[in-house]
Amino acid sequence: MKIDSIQVKDWRNFQEASYQLKPGLNFITGQNGCGKTNLLEAISYLSFARSFRKSPDRDLIRNSCSKAYVKGIFTCESEKYSKQVEATLTTSGKQIKVDGKKAKTLSSFVGTVLTMVFEPKLVFLFKDEPSERRKLMDETLSSIDSKYLYSLQRYRKVLRERNQALVTMADDEIVGVLTNELIRVSFPLVQSRLSLIKELGVKGDKYFQQLFGSSSKLRFTYRTNTIVDDDMETYTRKMIAQYDRKKSYERIHRMTMIGPHRDDLVAYLDDKPLGSYGSQGQNRLASLSVTLSLAEMIKEKRGEDPILVLDDVMSDLDTEKQKKLLDTIQGFQQVLLSGSSLDEDAEKVNVIEIKSDVVDEEKGGQ
């Protein structure tokens, strides 16, 4: 998949601008604060209808404006078709359209545009809260399979209902019904995550060796308080027993203490937890390796390259590692890379410079 053009209006610090993109490497540049990250954020927004910087929608609307607008034209190479995706944001909500038709639900929209994003804060992926790593797994798996997204949404709904039942001290029969349903919808989530982490172990270490060139081995585990079993009946029976053991504890704390909503993806470098013992450089390259690995998985499962979005990835890499990264990403159909300078053959790169006349300098940007 590739993006052919992007149009933004009243998005962050952009007044109005449009850019043409090409297959291969696209380098987005400009003065500091011109809005390089803002443009990548707009493109990524057309994948999940939310900012990869966790900003609320109201912060994406330019100062003194009532709405923001983004439109992208995408080409799906494997199936030979183009799609137009639009997002209109107001202070009261948002609307997503695909080929002029309003997307009724998030699940009907996610997976239309495939992107994989690396942004500077991912350096702290394995130092951050487990929720950030669960989010990364969930977004990747939702892009691969709409059934996963449906199961995830169903799980979250039942989880809210069960937590509410615990808060209101509902009787055991009501909690038991919700427990059985929670176990049922959790099974495909756990199985999909386990499969993803198994593949990540192979691909992640491969990319880490390519970029870092060391003998250190990168591996991943799934830290869970659920039951790891690929048989649904066995899983259900053991999970019921698990919940029974936690029954009094959950009643006291009035919240669900078991399930994939509390699980974690943990990285190890030479058998030491990366988040605790790894240097910032090792954490950066490990997080970048995860990004490339997940992009490769999407390509294999969907038969289509995701658009690889790399925001300010070069700034803390030495010249040798920059070259290794540029060599590595050549395998992807389209890469969007932001930065201030790039030591690469100009003929191989589509350079997009953000000019000062299309942005509000006083609001700034990245």
Predicted feature descriptions by range:
Residues 1-31, 173-307, 316, 320, ...:
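Conserved NTPase motor "head" modules and their coupling/switch loops across ABC/AAA+ ATPases, GTPases
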Residues 36:
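Conserved lysine of the Walker
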Residues 44:
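Helix-to-loop junction immediately C-terminal to a conserved catalytic motif
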Residues 48-126, 130-132, 138-144, 148, ...:
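Nucleotide-state sensing region of NTPase/ATPase domains
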Residues 124-126, 131-176, 180-183:
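Long, charged N-terminal accessory/stalk domains
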Residues 311-313:
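Walker B catalytic acidic pair
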